[in-house]
UniProtKB/Swiss-Prot annotation:
Organism of this sequence: Caulobacter vibrioides (strain ATCC 19089 / CIP 103742 / CB 15) (Caulobacter crescentus)
Enzyme Commission number: 2.3.1.234
Residues holding Fe cation: 123, 127, 316
Listed Gene3D superfamilies: 3.30.420.40
Cofactor note: Binds 1 Fe(2+) ion per subunit.
GO process annotations (BP): tRNA threonylcarbamoyladenosine modification
InterPro entries: ATPase_NBD, Gcp-like_dom, KAE1/TsaD, TsaD
Cofactor section: Fe(2+)
Annotated residues for binding of substrate: 145-149, 178, 191, 288
Protein name: tRNA N6-adenosine threonylcarbamoyltransferase
Top-level taxon: Bacteria
Family the entry assigns: Belongs to the KAE1 / TsaD family.
Keywords: Acyltransferase, Cytoplasm, Iron, Metal-binding, Transferase, tRNA processing
Length: 367
């Protein structure tokens, strides 16, 4: 549905795609200025920690238990009421379908009760715009979306307009961080714990595989690194050895991300004017210091500006969902109340159709 809105917009965002129950109220001014009025996140770390990862059934039940209170707290903290909302933006996928259904159903209920439009947001589109929560970033830009479930390079030319340049052919970078951290006996979530352990380690001590060296595309692969590091971890007996392996893994992931970004920048430069050379990194792995340093070096080398979300908005949050919804609503784009939850939902669906070998799994289109 379309019905352009040029005035200020007050949007409630809801995020329940994995193990964070989050709600946020964001104001988007008519000139595009964004203000986060509240951001409330309910974590489920303690529920999933004994299992070393997210258990979908536990996550969905936890969302059901907490979504009411968290949304109410976000509205209260913003100093507004539900009746003041101009729209509701809820993650509709991709993600764990049980959790996605909880947030989307709650969003539909609020929208229906208040007579407000609903925007069913692609979780990845939320990450794509998340850097705009901390800075005014114009379109177009080159985006590295890197998290526990996703690893993609995208050319973003406008709201919802994404062209995929590269994607992982197996595991995501964040998954590699988490699984290797688990093999090292580190607590969940593993990525931040591995980064902490890596401080002072020797990244050259262990020989770790480098993926897809013979290819000149922008795709990623982390399964070989994950397997090799897990095997080495089984043999380690000292803290120094564990520290060195953590440093090596972090360096290997940062190097591969940097190499593919460098390739993508060269492709992007061929079709864009110098004033449009903007690079954005988003997703949970964007909080890793070694990764940021490697990507900053790519930007300096290729003449790109660098932007990343504030650290609070790197991992899953509802402010980015509210912003993505506000951007769509400002263009008059919103959804019917029969919008469905989509566990698989590519940002660039054309690329998914053009390359089904990389884009489809047993459960449908990959993210």
């Amino acid at each position: 549905m379309t019905s352009p809105k040029q005035s200020d917009l007050l949007i409630l965002g809801l995020e329940t795609s994995c193990d964070e129950t989050a709600a946020s109220v964001v104001r988007r001014a008519a000139d595009g200025t964004v203000t986060v009025l509240s951001s409330v996140i309910g974590t489920q770390f303690e529920k999933h920690a004994p299992f070393g990862g997210v258990v979908p059934e536990i996550a969905a039940r936890a969302h059901v238990e907490s979504i009411d209170a968290i949304a109410a707290e976000a509205v209260r903290a913003a100093g507004v009421g539900f009746g003041d909302l101009d729209g509701v933006a809820a993650t509709a996928g991709p993600g764990l379908v049980g959790g996605v259904m909880v947030g989307l159903a709650f969003g539909k209920a609020v929208a229906l009760a208040r007579g407000a439009p609903l925007v069913a947001v692609n979780h990845l589109e939320g990450h794509a715009v998340s850097a705009r929560l901390g800075a005014d970033i114009a379109y177009p830009f080159l985006l590295l979306l890197v998290s526990g479930g996703h690893c993609q390079l995208l050319e973003v030319s406008g709201v919802g307009a994404c062209k995929r340049l590269g994607t992982t052919i197996d595991d995501a970078a964040g998954e590699a961080f988490d699984k290797i951290a688990k093999s090292l006996g580190l607590p969940y979530p593993g990525g931040p714990a591995l980064e902490k352990l890596a401080v002072g380690g020797d990244p050259t001590r262990y020989a770790l595989p480098r993926a897809l060296l013979g290819r000149k595309d922008c795709d990623f692969s982390f399964s070989g690194l994950k397997t090799a590091a897990a095997r080495i971890a089984e043999t380690l007996t000292t803290d120094d050895a564990r520290r060195d392996l953590a440093a090596g893994v972090q360096a290997a992931i940062a190097r591969q991300l940097s190499e593919r970004v460098d390739r993508a920048m060269k492709l992007y430069k061929d079709s864009h004017d110098p004033e449009d050379l903007r690079f954005v990194v988003a997703g949970g792995v964007a909080a890793n210091g070694a990764v940021r340093a490697a990507l900053l070096a790519d930007c300096e080398k290729n003449g790109f500006s660098f932007a990343a979300p504030p650290l609070a908005y790197c991992t899953d949050n509802a402010a980015m969902i509210a912003l993505a919804g506000a951007e769509r609503l400002a263009l008059g784009i919103f959804d019917d109340l029969d919008a469905i939850a989509r566990p698989r939902w590519p940002l660039d669906e054309a690329a998914a159709l053009a390359n089904p070998a990389n884009a489809y799994g047993r459960k449908g289109a990959k993210a």
